[in-house]
UniProtKB/Swiss-Prot annotation:
Glycans are attached at N38. Its EC number is 1.11.1.9. Its main location: secreted. The keyword Secreted applies. Residues 1-18 form the signal peptide. The gene is gpx-3. PANTHER family: GLUTATHIONE PEROXIDASE, GLUTATHIONE PEROXIDASE-RELATED. It comes from Caenorhabditis elegans. This is Glutathione peroxidase 3. It is an enzyme of class 1 (oxidoreductase). It is found in: Secreted, Extracellular space. GO terms for cellular component: extracellular space. The keyword Glycoprotein applies.
Length: 224
């Protein structure tokens, strides 16, 4: 398939058959407090959209909202909430780290070099660009045999938010585990020391109102 055709095909499919997430209702109580751990997210290396490797220690001292994302999902409109949230809290130390993933109904088919065009021109579209504190990295697996070590860590550290993960025919990975990420736009809130503190189901959002009190709590805490 020619370069760029993957994204073009995905745009066409989204237009024709209306690809969306399995649910769009907010469930404000779908969150859990994480367990204490001696490890931190600063121990993990990640890949940029340009194929270079870096680590998360560059965000030491910040409160981090960690999100797995996808372009062709109803929850992609949450991107339009991210920028105002970051604008409000960036001076206090909030940043957002996003990892595209194609494991949920193949809703992120683009290659790394195509991802930003998908966000700008398709969903959320209308020329959307990320806030300077919204950092989008290369595609990863968040579940299954090849899940990224970062996600293995945060899933082990934070209890599951729901009893049922989803339909197996919509999950593009194996094996399915009880701790798995449930869908696109699941979130982990990380404190200034790199410790996972709270886990939020994708539906626990309500334009950010569900997560905001927890963000403010962690912003008020000093780094060790």
């Amino acid at each position: 398939m020619a370069p760029g055709s993957v994204l073009s095909l995905a745009v066409a499919l989204a237009t024709i058959i209306g690809i969306s997430c399995t649910a769009t209702v907010d469930e404000t109580m779908r969150w859990k407090e994480c367990l204490n751990t001696n490890q931190s997210i600063f121990d993990f290396q990640i890949e940029t959209l340009q194929g270079e490797y870096t680590d998360l220690s560059q965000y030491r001292g910040k409160v981090i909202l960690l999100v797995n994302v996808a372009t062709f999902c109803a929850y992609t409109q949450q991107y339009t909430d991210f920028n105002p949230m970051l604008e409000k809290y960036q001076a206090q130390g909030l940043t957002l780290v996003a990892f595209p993933c194609n494991q949920f109904y193949l809703q992120e088919p683009a290659e790394n070099h195509e991802l930003m065009n998908g966000l700008t021109y398709v969903r959320p579209g209308n020329g959307w660009t990320p806030h300077q504190e919204l950092h989008i990295y290369g595609k990863i697996d968040v579940n299954g045999d090849n899940h990224h070590p970062l996600y293995e860590f945060v899933k082990e550290s934070c209890p599951q938010t729901v009893d049922k993960i989803g339909k197996t025919d919509e999950l593009m990975y194996n094996p399915v585990r009880p701790s798995d990420i449930t869908w696109n736009f699941e979130k982990f809130l990380i404190d200034r020391n790199g410790q996972p503190r709270f886990r939020f189901h994708p539906t626990a959002w309500s334009h950010g109102d569900v997560v905001t009190p927890f963000i403010e709590q962690l912003l008020a805490e000093p780094a060790n």
